Amino acid sequence: MGAGVIGTEFLKGQGLGNQLFSYVTARCIALERGCAFGTAGQEQLAVNIHSKKGMYFMDMDLGERIETGTKDGLAPAAEYGTGTAAADGSGACAARSSGVRKEELRRYDEKELRFFQGTSVHDMEHGCYVAGEDGALHSLPDNTLIYGNMQDERYFARYREQIREWLRVRPEYDTHEFTRDNLCILNLRGGEYTGHPELYLSRGYWLKGMKNMRKIRPDMEFIIVTDDPEAAHKLLPGLPVYHSDLDRDYVMLKNARYLLLSNSSFAFFPAYTSDTLQAAIAPKYWARHNVSDGYWASEQNIYSIFQYQDRSGRLFTPEECRQELEAYKKTSGKYKNAGKRPEGMKAAWCRLESRVRYGMFYLRKIWYSLTRRAGWKVPYGKNVG
């Protein structure tokens, strides 16, 4: 097998944000450990419900190609990046065949921690993911594939300059059309989020965020970059909405000066590798901004480059968020009961809580619809397209 390798696998249907976290974390761990780096499932990179083109706008080095089996044996090499962009812009990622089979490598699953609670059907059935850094990643043995969330900044912070090079956008796609001193881009996540009361950020979050941005610059203007233009128009009527090919959405975020973000992984690396970003606001408690009483879902998503806005519109530094979370852990019954499913009367209460939350969520959607039909528009709206 030769020199040892540390790597990860790009999974079918996985979003680009999650794939980039897996890639960056595994590559940084390999660098830290002095191992070769490799990836399995390279044909799945940047192929999902939003785009089928693959990673055409970056020349990513995917490391050693770790072979995965098909019903006829190995997946054919033609399915993988060749190191040279094709005429249509696809296949721009470099890969090197290593002869290593996936089944020859150890599998390591990042440690998880989940709360089973009544905040949603998902949290009742699958649990709410709240885990932080898994320190074991830093001492993994050679020839290991890493799986998991892998989104803690402590996995990769020391290699930020290298990450900028690894994720450099090809010049022909790297436009600064929306790099303006008084323009803030809202990255609104719609899609499957719109049916989840624990996830989908309310109109109030965005209005308070815009108000906070106006404190930085009273003349701040706003546009939306989203995967779901219909949801964006319904939630925030009056703001210009943009949704284009994957490269344009990514680059608009990367080259912005101001960002108001949703609880989605997609925007992190555009922000993290940006040379233009001056301020970014993200939802406090991340994926449970709407319902948390102090826990983070997950604490991996407390990042040094963001300020975090709570439900009342107050802003917190990453350091303040970590300090609050550590204090919460010492007194919260949730951490004491992590991993335990509710039973009996407690389970019945959780189901009732979940139904009430869904009911309130859909009543709020009805209210949004009524106000929109009555002509309400975002007070900060201005067409800057």
What are the language-model segments listed below?
Residues 2-49:
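N-terminal pre-catalytic "stem/leader" segment of glycosyltransferase-like enzymes
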Residues 7-8, 36-42, 185-187, 223-225, ...:
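A structural signal for short, well-ordered beta-strand segments and their strand-loop junctions
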Residues 18, 39, 45-51, 154-155, ...:
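Short catalytic/ligand-binding loop motif for oxyanion handling, primarily in non-cytosolic enzymes
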Residues 267, 272-339:
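Catalytic binding pocket for nucleotide-activated donors in carbohydrate/polymer assembly enzymes
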